[in-house]
Amino acid sequence: IAADSGTLSDDECYTVTNEINQAFVDTIRATGGNNENRFLLIAGFGTDITNTCDSRFVMPTDSADSKLLVSVHYYDPSGYCIMTSLSSWGDKNDYESQNETLEKMTKFTDEGYGVIIGEYGVLIEQNDLKDGTLDYYTNFLNNCDLYGYAPMLWDCNNLYDRNAGKIIYDDIAAFYQSRSVS
């Protein structure tokens, strides 16, 4: 703990996170049975891609071979995805930024870890898709396909009608249907 603030420094936060992740793996593996070999999902640092790719974040050691996966979230740029300060996406810089950020996670796939993007999405405002939403999703999912990541679309209670059991917006439903693997 930083002596002058009573809070953990960034380095200390990474150390504590790594210790918790190692304790998680050790605890699960020690219980025996199927837990000796089950897949375990390790949350990245703050579930943020850049922070998770920082050299201070270390995947735990594991007695099981190739059974650890790392999970992050992707809401970049936040002004577009989860806030209202950006209303469109799709210029050259947007594509480059998304591509560069997602490529960072190859640090883990190159080491044999699976990557799960446990949340991603673009907030829908006033029942209208933001300009470039389908382009954003297309490029994002193309990157996931390229690198072998498993993406999970997150619903902020305005995309999926739980009572009807379907996506509310026909263009988004058609988009995902067109990407389905049969």
Give the role of each language-model region:
Residues 1-86, 103-122, 146:
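Active-site region of glycoside hydrolase catalytic domains
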Residues 97-105, 134-141:
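Short, acidic/polar
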Residues 48-50, 91, 122-123, 169, ...:
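Alpha-helix initiation/capping motif
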Residues 2, 46-52, 95-96, 123-134, ...:
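Acidic-and-aromatic substrate-binding clefts and catalytic sites of carbohydrate-active enzymes
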Residues 69-72, 97-99, 143-146, 180-181:
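Short, surface-exposed, polar/charged, turn-prone segments marking secondary-structure boundaries
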Residues 84-98:
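Gly/Pro-rich active-site loop or hairpin
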